[in-house]
Swiss-Prot record:
Its main location: plastid. The keyword Protein transport does not apply. HAMAP family: PSII_PsbB_CP47 (MF_01495). This is Photosystem II CP47 reaction center protein. The gene is psbB. The keyword Ion transport does not apply. PSII is composed of 1 copy each of membrane proteins PsbA, PsbB, PsbC, PsbD, PsbE, PsbF, PsbH, PsbI, PsbJ, PsbK, PsbL, PsbM, PsbT, PsbX, PsbY, PsbZ, Psb30/Ycf12, at least 3 peripheral proteins of the oxygen-evolving complex and a large number of cofactors. It forms dimeric complexes. Belongs to the PsbB/PsbC family. PsbB subfamily. Binds multiple chlorophylls. PSII binds additional chlorophylls, carotenoids and specific lipids. GO terms for cellular component: chloroplast thylakoid membrane; photosystem II. It is found in: Plastid, Chloroplast thylakoid membrane.
Amino acid sequence: MGLPWYRVHTVVLNDPGRLLSVHIMHTALVAGWAGSMALYELAVFDPSDPVLDPMWRQGMFVIPFMTRLGITNSWGGWSITGGTITNPGIWSYEGVAGAHIVFSGLCFLAAIWHWVYWDLEIFCDERTGKPSLDLPKIFGIHLFLSGVACFGFGAFHVTGLYGPGIWVSDPYGLTGKVQPVNPAWGVEGFDPFVPGGIASHHIAAGTLGILAGLFHLSVRPPQRLYKGLRMGNIETVLSSSIAAVFFAAFVVAGTMWYGSATTPIELFGPTRYQWDQGYFQQEIYRRVGAGLAKNQSLSEAWSKIPEKLAFYDYIGNNPAKGGLFRAGSMDNGDGIAVGWLGHPIFRDKEGRELFVRRMPTFFETFPVVLVDGDGIVRADVPFRRAESKYSVEQVGVTVEFYGGELNGVSYSDPATVKKYARRAQLGEIFELDRATLKSDGVFRSSPRGWFTFGHASFALLFFFGHIWHGARTLFRDVFAGIDPDLDAQVEFGAFQKLGDPTTRRQVV
């Protein structure tokens, strides 16, 4: 046929058997990739430290999605929450990966079968004997089946009625675990951070899908609507399917980047807005304040801060700090976190407590400025020593650590004080191992950033695909350059399959 590469899909027009075949093969490729990627990630994943080296620091992409749906154990004897297990059961990480690979193989065989046996009776119109698909009926069947799956997921899997539940955590990502979730039928169900909304919305959407599917199975579209929306043309199906996919991609890009109950920070890492708003810093200060109110010393109050919470309050975990073209996991950037050094408190020679101004998200370098409780600049690390008035040396700044590995240690040496002031710009201070992975010290994004970028990019691409194919199917006669009612010698362009023998000819 000699088709150019961008026209090859012409071969499955008016050929329902092979159209089905290529879609089954596509499913085989997707499932095969998912299973293979899961096995690769399991081969390189280190589960030994879920607090300072969680899956999102290691650049895991498919493991978080399995985990949020209730998979926590491995046949290797470890659990994602830490510790060891003896009986992980069939639905472990490896079990899910294997199921995808087996499913991929079956789809591969089914695709070959449908490619060879393409001319099935079921695809033929009994009145004409020609290949024909009842597209509105197929739409009803698919809508009904997807409604059943959606309802089943919400009513059984998420609620724990028949399934494990989903990953649920507190607002600060400290206590996450898989547990059943009750549907939230009140207004709270519309809060994107309430897990109950996941159950209730799937139940509601599934019910709607079942009813809509039954409607489209039992009611035929009016002739004017059928012709106006070109419901008999397979390209109409392509256009509307692309619309559904790009809409879903835009939605999940939003829920991932801005955060929601479906994208827990324990599995995908914190969002950039939690750094921008000082979300974890405020909670840490609240806990320290509560400890001091109970007559704890500063050292005791800071020592009670969970290392996990302190680690979230570190700019290296901000997904917006990694450039789009910096390949690799976060651990390949600033290194593997080994331990929290503690919280540094800076004071000038007059005893005032000073706070280091933190680096905003989109800065690579930022001046080191220390302010007092009223926001007045009291010290800095000057660019030009000759004009400095607030240098660490001139102001006599000291630093003392509370909590962490350096608890109770203080420094007055200006070089050391400046070193920790620079590091305090980046949030809580951690010891990072850059030798093991030969980390280069340049921040990387988390899977949250990659997922968002990928889905937003493809959503935009698919949006144009929807416009393109929608325009082609709606204005097919215009693009072909003929009037469909014109009795021309050869109706060139009215038939989409090259070499179609049914093209009407007229002898002049």
